[in-house]
Amino acid sequence: MKKTVTAVALLCALSSTAIAPTFAADDDEAARLKAIEEYRKQIADGNPSDLLAMEGEELWRTPYGPKNQSLEQCDLGLGPGVVKGAAAKLPRYFPDTGKVEDLESRLMTCMERLQGVERQKVIDSPWRKGEKLRMDKIVAYIVTESNGEKIDVDMSHPKMKEMYELGKRMFFYRTGPFDFSCATCHGKDGQRIRLQELPNLTKHEGAAAGWGSWPAYRVSNSQFWTMQMRLNDCFRQQRTAEPIYGSDATIALSVYMAANGNGGVMLTPGIKR
């Protein structure tokens, strides 16, 4: 009997010890989130992406390529040359190509048609160098012109619906030696890696926050990342084959995220740790 009482007392003591830190942990979590939010506000003041956007606007207006033409007649979906609000409505179906295109793939179409810059030249260029660096700067300019706009991706066309379903399948597809998918990190509420919260991209709130804040400047490596680069890095982390730049794979994933985030607000370029 004495042993039983002692065991029960010990169990209660251990239980109390285990339960007590829960409240402290909750307090610590709230304080941590508040501190991170304050940090993000501070680093967002004077986003370095603004410098790239200024260069991108100049590149948009400057004649270039074999045809020595600017991109000022590029139709991003709202009419030739209209940049304001265009990124908030991408990806979208374009009748002139018969395809669904995101921002980068549409820009490659314009570069090829207007300037004579071959699409493959952009695809083959290393990240943040050559034609891809030019692309990054132009992307920074265009998404800046949609900052504060509502995410408004038109899903009415059948090809957009097809892309959404393809993107959804890819999002949940497990691959690589670690056997995980996009959903492993971004398919549940309340997940994080170290200090980084992971938005649930299957729900509106998470998709709006995730999609609506990319492209972004990454403070940790002092680099501007487009959505194409961000998605490629996800594949790299899966230790699987990275998709071709501007391929249907990345466009489909973008359609899935953007459609889930419809109605949210574009805060682009974002700024990340």
From Swiss-Prot:
It is found in: Periplasm. It is an enzyme of class 2 (transferase). One of its GO terms (cellular component) is cytochrome complex. Residues 1-24 form the signal peptide. Cysteine persulfide at Cys-234. The keyword Cytoplasm does not apply. It holds the Pfam family SoxA-TsdA_cyt-c. Disulfide bonds join C74-C110. Keywords: Disulfide bond, Electron transport, Heme, Iron, Metal-binding, Periplasm, Signal, Transferase, Transport. The keyword Heme applies. Binds 1 heme group per subunit. The active site is at C234 (cysteine persulfide intermediate). Induction: By thiosulfate. Its cofactor is heme. It catalyses: L-cysteinyl-[SoxY protein] + thiosulfate + 2 Fe(III)-[cytochrome c] = S-sulfosulfanyl-L-cysteinyl-[SoxY protein] + 2 Fe(II)-[cytochrome c] + 2 H(+); S-sulfanyl-L-cysteinyl-[SoxY protein] + thiosulfate + 2 Fe(III)-[cytochrome c] = S-(2-sulfodisulfanyl)-L-cysteinyl-[SoxY protein] + 2 Fe(II)-[cytochrome c] + 2 H(+). NCBIfam families: thiosulf_SoxA. Belongs to the SoxA family. C-type monoheme cytochrome, which is part of the SoxAX cytochrome complex involved in sulfur oxidation. The SoxAX complex catalyzes the formation of a heterodisulfide bond between the conserved cysteine residue on a sulfur carrier SoxYZ complex subunit SoxY and thiosulfate or other inorganic sulfur substrates. This leads to the liberation of two electrons, which may be transferred from the SoxAX complex to another cytochrome c that then channels them into the respiratory electron transport chain. Some electrons may be used for reductive CO(2) fixation. This is L-cysteine S-thiosulfotransferase subunit SoxA.
